[in-house]
Structures are given as C-alpha cells and as structure tokens.
C-alpha cells in the first residue's frame, strides 16, 4: 500500500464526533487484566485498520542541538552537557537525498525535525522548500519545528505539509516537573494553529519520565478529547540520555508501556498509534505485543533525531517473522 492508499484509509475514518473520555475511565482500562485489555484494544484496532499492516516513517534531524528550551529528557537542549553537537540547518540537497533513500528502503512518510523553540521566518522558508521537494517524491511529509507563530502553519499547509508533530509530552499536572521554559498551554496553542490551518495533527507523549499511571491516563484523555483527536499519536518510551536531568530515571515496566499503547488505541480508535523512541531497547516479543495492542506505525531507520533505533535489517526480519506488511 502506497501513500495514496494511506490517505484513503485516513479519509475513510468515521466522521462522527469522538466520545469524551474521563481520567477515571482510562484508568479503568489500565486496571484491566492485561490479556483482556489487549483483546479489547485489538478488537477496536481491527474495526478501523488492517491488523497486519504497519506504517513505516523515517525521521531526520535537519537542525540538531543548541535548543534554548529546558526539556529534561532532551539531548539537544543547550542547557545540558550531552554528547550532541550543534549543527546548522541541513542543506536542501542532503534532505532530499535522505528522503529518497528512505523511500527506497520502504518508508512512506518522511519526518523532518529541527531543534529550536520555534522557527524564524528565514529558517521556515528553507523548511518549506524541504517540504515541497519531499512531497514531490510521492511521500507523506511531516515536520516538528517547535512552537509556531501566527501565519506559519498556513505557509506550511500551502507548501503541501501533511502532518505537523508537536507532542504534549505528558499531562498538564506533571508537565512543570520536566519542562519549565514553556507551558503546556503553549503546546496546545500550536496544535490549535496546526488544526486551524488544515494540517493533520501528530501529537503524543513520552512515557517513563517519572509520571504516575494517573498522569499517563490524563495525557491520553487530553489527546483524545481535543476538538479532533490527533491523526497520528507517537508513544515514546523514555531513552535516558547522559547529561540530562532524566539520565538516571529507572526503566518503565514493559507491560505498563503495552497498557499505554492499548489505552491509546481504545481512546483514539482511528488514529495511527506509533512506536517511537525507545524501540531499540525493546525485544521483538515486546514490539509484537505492542502491535497486538493496537500500535500500527513505527519509525524506521537507524536513528531518531539523536537516539538510536533498530537497524533496518532487524525490522525487516521482525516483519517477516510476524507475517505483517509494511505500508
């Protein structure tokens, strides 16, 4: 299935208003016996998607390091002493070459990320050229550029952008414990601008930052209860980066991660639920459980911005073992 078929799946999603969820209801999902929760999530998944198809996206850092923000998990913050080297915005020809290589390896969506609080107008103009050139390859396009100013989302839409990623990261209650340089409401404002411009929203969170199960449930509720749920929901498993405040965070129970995938699938039945950062540390068996719980998208390629990802050969072998197809 190519990009046009992906669009057909999305456009075929029910247009009826999504139900409103409460934190107590999502906590009730988390509290179910794991096998019952996965069974329910798989049923919801099968009603809306091909259960044996996984969408593959590639993520490229087009501007690395030197970010002014203080996100406690991030290796690209200028406030922390990490191994990430600051790099300027990547030349257009290098971005296009990377997109072509990703397409040749089976990716249908190409995501471009830049480490800054938000794009300056002259930098945005260069990103617009990247979007146009990648779009011309027949790939879906996505960017993650931080917070947007008035009018910038419309420019991205005019360039042909399909998705804008801006994660909520965690719920409003826990947010101030991991980020202080901007607010949870700032992120919601950018999502509103993206939605108003007619761009598909990609927004999810990071699990394992020290938040409680209630915080995780509240994040899912916040996403599901947006005026329109995100079309794409990346779920990241924290990768502790040396030099960041979360470097020594204990690992999350893998089954809790599966529960989060399942709860997200049930609460957002027509969204693409993506396995994102942290997959390199997951066993094939854990990833298979996540697919069974409703994940149907993944990042494909050796790196996600600055963290590792399973190599392509491992992913291809996993798909063959599971009998699933890439789209």
Swiss-Prot record:
EC number(s) from the headed UniProt entry: 2.8.1.6
InterPro entries membership: Aldolase_TIM, BATS_dom, Biotin_synth/BioAB, Biotin_synthase, Elp3/MiaA/NifB-like_rSAM, rSAM
Cofactors named for this entry: [4Fe-4S] cluster; [2Fe-2S] cluster
One Pfam family here: BATS
Taxonomic path: Bacteria, Pseudomonadati, Pseudomonadota, Betaproteobacteria, Rhodocyclales
Residue sites binding [4Fe-4S] cluster per the record: 67, 71, 74
Family: Belongs to the radical SAM superfamily. Biotin synthase family.
Name recorded for this polypeptide: Biotin synthase
GO biological process: biotin biosynthetic process
Radical SAM core domain ranges (all copies): 52-279
Binding site for [2Fe-2S] cluster: 111, 142, 202, 274
Subunit structure: Homodimer.
Cited function: Catalyzes the conversion of dethiobiotin (DTB) to biotin by the insertion of a sulfur atom into dethiobiotin via a radical-based mechanism.
Catalytic activities: (4R,5S)-dethiobiotin + (sulfur carrier)-SH + 2 reduced [2Fe-2S]-[ferredoxin] + 2 S-adenosyl-L-methionine = (sulfur carrier)-H + biotin + 2 5'-deoxyadenosine + 2 L-methionine + 2 oxidized [2Fe-2S]-[ferredoxin]
CDD domains found in the cross-reference section: Radical_SAM
Molecular functions per Gene Ontology: 2 iron, 2 sulfur cluster binding; 4 iron, 4 sulfur cluster binding; biotin synthase activity; iron ion binding
Annotated cofactor note: Binds 1 [4Fe-4S] cluster. The cluster is coordinated with 3 cysteines and an exchangeable S-adenosyl-L-methionine.
UniProtKB keywords: 2Fe-2S, 4Fe-4S, Biotin biosynthesis, Iron, Iron-sulfur, Metal-binding, S-adenosyl-L-methionine, Transferase
UniProt pathway: Cofactor biosynthesis; biotin biosynthesis; biotin from 7,8-diaminononanoate: step 2/2
Transmembrane residue ranges: none
SUPFAM superfamilies linked: Radical SAM enzymes
